[in-house]
Design a protein with these regions (language model features):
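Extracytosolic ligand-binding ectodomains
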Residues: 1-444
Length: 444
């Protein structure tokens, strides 16, 4: 008599098995969507950027939540079982106007480029969380967005972008052991699992602006700084450098995101003999300066930190920054071969032209992520962190021709070299003003 087979219960798979998306190509990397955003009609407010430095997307467009990229097969015969894509999180933590497509599309391009170069030969999935937090929305949204990405199995997260959210997430990131590659220039955002391919460097920006004003021969300047996680750092480093250089601050004003009394403050600065103006902060307040200067009929030399690059967020924001010099990241026009070639590939891949700083920043960030994954012993967050620290002298599309990305133990600030520049926005033209390369006074 044969034994009666048991009737269970059976141990079923807790999670579904990997599936092949069926999109792989023999000679090039392939993605399941034509671009990172799905808006391709006129049913969204706003329009594409009118000038080369403005955002190339549409205000209000949405991201595909899941974007899958396959490496070229190049005739490889597998054992038949599909590999599950390694997941990279994208944390959208702020309103970015016309720039969402200019973040996601270069991210796709960077991963496709790396796969075409043979850097990594396993599928990758971008998982997008739109979880906007500080300074305009509640802090908890961004925290939950990051945790959701980690719970989805992401091995690294691109973002947050801004200082408030990077700093408020820092302890959580270290606790969850899933590295963030943020864009913040906050000097305090650097710890075990916190990296940056940064859209600036707040202390350095304050010093750069003071040195720029001194280089123009100014002895009296007015100073604005914006309330927020990094506002005091902007103020402190500028103030200390201005004092060292013999600059007198005629009036110091702390601004809220929606500033009050700008005309009165500027009028008082002019009456006090201010020869130039400095602004340091997140950037919300900068939207209002053009109107205030026009009302006064005053056009003094003025300089700000990387909030200047909000010119790419929306066409209206660019108009608000008319007449300012600011800390930028794009190098001298035509000088960075990596930037020029990437822009050509971008146009060929996505059928549109967009050359603003976010395109370069997004590309460099995604390159860091995919190379960190490729360097890792296995696709876990802890090993990807170690893989990021192995990146050495990686070419950068941002900055000048000498800019590169490099990490190491206790060195999680990626950009090295000429990654900060000075530009001026005037009469609708974004003009390169120079690299900032100070010299010792003793040089004569």
């Amino acid at each position: 008599m044969e034994p009666t087979p048991p009737e269970g219960p059976w141990a079923e798979r807790l999670f579904p098995p990997p599936t092949d998306h069926g999109i792989a190509e023999p000679d090039r990397a392939a993605t399941n969507v034509p671009s990172g955003t799905g808006t391709d009609s006129g049913d969204v407010a706003g329009a594409t950027g009118e000038r080369w430095y403005e955002g190339g997307g549409r205000i209000g467009e949405k991201a595909h939540r899941e974007i899958v990229i396959y490496p070229p097969t190049r005739g490889l015969a597998t054992q038949g079982d599909p590999f599950e894509p390694v997941k990279i999180g994208v944390l959208v933590d702020m309103d970015i106007g016309q720039l969402l497509a200019d973040w996601l599309d270069p991210t796709i391009l960077a991963i496709e480029d790396a796969m075409n170069e043979g850097v990594y030969d396993r599928p990758v999935q971008l998982v997008v969380a739109d979880a906007r937090g500080l300074p305009r929305e509640n802090f908890l949204k961004c925290r939950k967005g990051y945790e959701w990405l980690v719970d989805q199995g992401c091995v690294v997260v691109l973002g947050p972008m801004i200082s408030d959210n990077c700093l408020q997430l820092q302890s959580l990131i270290n606790e969850r052991h899933c590295s963030s590659i943020g864009w913040t220039g906050a000097w305090r955002f650097s710890s075990d699992y916190c990296f940056t391919v940064a859209n600036g460097d707040i202390p350095t920006e304050g010093v750069m602006c003071a040195q720029w004003l001194a280089g123009k021969g100014f002895k009296k300047v007015g100073m604005f700084w914006e309330q927020g996680s990094s506002g005091r750092d902007y103020a402190d480093f500028f103030r200390e450098e201005a004092q060292r250089l013999g600059i007198t601050i005629t009036r110091e004003v702390r601004l809220g995101p929606n500033p009050r009394g700008l005309v009165d403050h500027l009028s008082a600065m002019r009456e006090a003999g201010s020869e130039g103006i400095y602004y340091g902060g997140y950037g919300y307040a900068t939207f209002h300066f053009a109107k205030a200067f026009a009302e006064l009929g005053w056009d003094p030399p003025r300089v700000m930190g990387t909030a200047f690059m909000f010119y790419s967020n929306s066409n209206e924001w660019a108009a608000g920054l008319e007449g300012w010099h600011g800390v930028d990241q794009l190098g001298e026009d035509g000088a960075n071969a990596n930037y020029n070639a990437m822009i050509d590939r971008f146009q060929k891949r996505f059928g549109r032209v967009s050359r603003n700083v976010v395109v370069a920043l997004a590309y460099d960030t995604a390159r860091a992520a995919i190379h960190g994954i490729a360097n890792a012993a296995m696709a876990t967050p802890e090993e990807v962190r170690n893989g990021l620290e192995r990146i050495r002298w990686m070419p950068a599309t941002n900055g000048g021709p000498s800019c590169y990305v490099q990490f190491g133990p206790h060195d999680h600030k990626g950009y090295k070299g000429d990654f900060l520049t000075i530009r001026e926005l005037r009469d609708g033209e974004l003009r390169f003003d120079g690299y900032h390369r100070p010299e010792w006074p003793s040089n004569g």
